[in-house]
């Protein structure tokens, strides 16, 4: 039984190393154009570093993907994280600054009602513990991840259950 255990542990270690290398390659492969996203409503842009890209992916997967895997919204399939949905919201959520504000204190799609008690956020960190330790830098990386995904996954990002 012990040799099998060693084989299992070795295989697990190889998978972890492969996953780590794959994530590093993923972030490095993205050119500047892909890593450039809108910073604020004025249209000002910013180019994310490979480290921010990698960090955003990890944090999104840990804190957001349970409900937003692939850019969908499991609780409301009509509103996803695709560019069209983000730009149609009030205020628009198609830039880093506004996405950060939304993650801190989410509102309904029309911006009229707080949904902090229903949607994980910094404001509702007591209810949603995964949000508890996220810093502004973490939120910046998560917002960046959301905004570069349409450039990487194209129509699959926010495309709904036909893809996921």
UniProtKB/Swiss-Prot annotation:
Keywords: Chloroplast, Electron transport, Heme, Iron, Membrane, Metal-binding, Photosynthesis, Photosystem II, Plastid, Signal, Thylakoid, Transport. Its cofactor is heme c. It is found in: Plastid, Chloroplast thylakoid membrane. NCBIfam families: PS_II_C550. Heme c binds at residues 64, 67-68, 131. This is Photosystem II extrinsic protein V. One of its GO terms (cellular component) is photosystem II. The gene is psbV. It comes from Gracilaria tenuistipitata var. liui. SUPFAM superfamilies: Cytochrome c. GO terms for molecular function: electron transfer activity; heme binding; iron ion binding. One of the extrinsic, lumenal subunits of photosystem II (PSII). PSII is a light-driven water plastoquinone oxidoreductase, using light energy to abstract electrons from H(2)O, generating a proton gradient subsequently used for ATP formation. The extrinsic proteins stabilize the structure of photosystem II oxygen-evolving complex (OEC), the ion environment of oxygen evolution and protect the OEC against heat-induced inactivation. It is a peripheral membrane protein. Binds 1 heme c group covalently per subunit. PSII is composed of 1 copy each of membrane proteins PsbA, PsbB, PsbC, PsbD, PsbE, PsbF, PsbH, PsbI, PsbJ, PsbK, PsbL, PsbM, PsbT, PsbY, PsbZ, Psb30/Ycf12, at least 3 peripheral proteins of the oxygen-evolving complex and a large number of cofactors. It forms dimeric complexes. The extrinsic subunits in red algae are PsbO (OEC33), PsbQ', cytochrome c-550 and PsbU. Its main location: plastid. GO terms for biological process: photosynthesis, light reaction; respiratory electron transport chain. The keyword Endoplasmic reticulum does not apply. Belongs to the cytochrome c family. PsbV subfamily. Residues 1-27 form the signal peptide.
């Amino acid at each position: 039984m012990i040799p099998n255990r060693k084989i299992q542990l070795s295989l697990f270690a190889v998978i972890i190393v492969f996953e780590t290398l794959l994530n590093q390659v993923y972030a490095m492969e993205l050119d500047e154009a892909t890593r450039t996203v809108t910073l604020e409503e004025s249209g000002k842009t910013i180019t994310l570093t490979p480290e921010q890209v990698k960090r955003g992916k990890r944090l999104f997967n840990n804190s957001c993907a349970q409900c937003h895997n692939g850019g969908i919204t499991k609780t409301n399939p009509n509103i996803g994280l695709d560019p069209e949905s983000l730009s149609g919201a009030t205020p628009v959520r198609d830039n880093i600054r506004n996405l950060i504000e939304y993650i801190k204190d989410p509102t309904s799609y029309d911006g009229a009602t707080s949904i902090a008690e229903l949607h994980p956020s910094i404001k509702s960190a007591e209810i949603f513990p995964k949000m508890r330790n996220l810093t502004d830098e973490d939120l910046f990386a998560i917002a960046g991840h959301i905004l570069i995904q349409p450039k990487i996954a194209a129509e699959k990002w926010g495309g709904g259950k036909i893809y996921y």
